[in-house]
Amino acid sequence: MASDGDGAAAVAALGISGGGGDDWAPPLRRNLPLLAPHEVKLAKLLLSEGQSHLFEHWPEPGVDDDKKRNFFDQVCRLNSSYPGGLASYIQNARKLLADSKAGKNPYDGFSPSVPSGEVLTFGDDNFVSLEEAGVKEARHAAFVLVAGGLGERLGYKGIKVALPRETTTGKCFLQHYIESILALQEASCKLVEGECNTKIPFVIMTSDDTNALTVKLLESNSYFGMEPSQVHILKQEKVACLADNDARLALDPNDKYKIQTKPHGHGDVHALLYSSGLLEQWKSTGRKWVLFFQDTNGLLFNAIPSALGVSATKGYNVNSLAVPRKAKEAIGGITKLTHVDGRTMVINVEYNQLDPLLRATGHPDGDANCETGYSPYPGNINQLILEIGPYMEELQKTHGAISEFVNPKYTDSTKTAFKSSTRLECMMQDYPKTLPPSAKVGFTVMDAWLTYAPVKNNPEDSAKVPKGNPYHSATSGEMAIYRANSLILRKAGAQIADPVIDTFNGQEVEVWPRITWIPRWGLIFKDVKAKVHSNSSVSQRSALVINGKNITIQGLSLDGTLIVNAKDEAKFNVTGHIENKGWTIQHVDHKDTSEKEEIRIRGFKFNKVEQLELNY
């Protein structure tokens, strides 16, 4: 403990003018002898930013001293994890809260227009050549998964990446992502003359909620075949909550020595990458691209090769992956914004802001479908491809700070008080907001059936979705995988039966044959086309599982369930008529607690009556 003399020196060191000495935060002043010099500096920072209320309840020295020190440990973490420190956070909050109270529109002065980008058609010559270009570039890429969320919104208590992507094989999202990256790594290396030892880096951004469970999932599954040195875990910290319009920090209702915190959003990934030193390491080893993606879109790797091919051939510094979007659909639209002062940016504009923005800037119909039947503003699916050189240059200026927003819930129309504390938030896809007009920012559009099936809504909420709108549930997410794989095989020439319509957990969906394959088998369409011949057919009630890189399908007539396993480079041709009782689909009520959560949230399970399993 410091002496009284040290305490007096500490008081003097605070140097707060205008009400210094005994007049400011007396409870803190009495406790200054407890504090180390760096904690005194943090105290000064808090007082300078109008946060003396944090100390009003502090008792005399000797009472709760450890809790007081823990308080400053937390303040130190909050200060070090935010670009510019806690003072910047409070100042930014004050400005954004004032703008919110005044009803200021962040898009004032901006006019929207349709940005330039690429619209791809699955399976045509252009698509195939872009996929091949993307595979060639993959060895120069690094992948970043933002996975800070639990599955509570889904009705699942675990981490979202541990959720089965589909239940035919039971493989979780994280396994599929890693196997897809490894397949890209292998295919890309094969295009290099001579030896290629490239290991594609994979970063996972976690949070306090998901970190330990993510590490456990990786370690208990031997990293799903990836070398542990390829995987980097970056944990994001939460940010301080704000109690009022003056940006006074909120204390935890259950602990008066702790500042209440909440997640800052997945925009933190940029600051974490900047501070980690990984970008410099990657650039020095020849990386050109950083690919960002979110945690539960089971189709996203269908889009990666061709989109990476677009980035490489078009020279995009930023490439946002997108899907065709119906006007007013509840998904953000990628939009070019031009300010009256000449500034331009290409960013995601949320759907509830896009329509009024268009109406206010000379588009009387607002967000309307064009002759294609879709809005000209494509739907953002939160997958970004950034060119590493310009990305690093931008982060040198911003240190990874991303344009923030605040969304307080006010008690009434005066906007003077909050119903509960709020905080600043930021989104990964808002990175382009700070880019200069010279930046080459574009997008790549692909059909949603091929690339977009997020799993984010629970059964109750999904059942309320109007008919015809996407459910974005575990039910629709799994069925979308079977639909995509069936349509890919159809395009390759196989005869795949039409789906039937069924309802699970109140959601009406198409049920296609349950077809799955490992990424090494069908990484790009050219691979699939080379392995599937037109004289093969699969009935609607069938399930086909392909576990092997060099399995070909020729003259197969499947009516039932077939699982084909081939080790490593073993080659095998699947042929002939195969019929068995197969796997039937059994309805499951989402309230049936006798079933596992991951089954209940889907509303179905497979009754494995009969199957043929071939091993080579």
From Swiss-Prot:
Cleaved signal peptide residues: none
Any one GO CC term of the record: pollen tube
A Pfam cross-reference name: UDPGP
Q: Which UniProt keywords apply?
A: Nucleotidyltransferase, Transferase
**Protein EC:** 2.7.7.64
List cofactor names only: Mg(2+); Mn(2+)
- Record protein name field: UDP-sugar pyrophosphorylase
This chain's source organism reads Oryza sativa subsp. japonica (Rice)
Q: Which gene codes for it?
A: USP
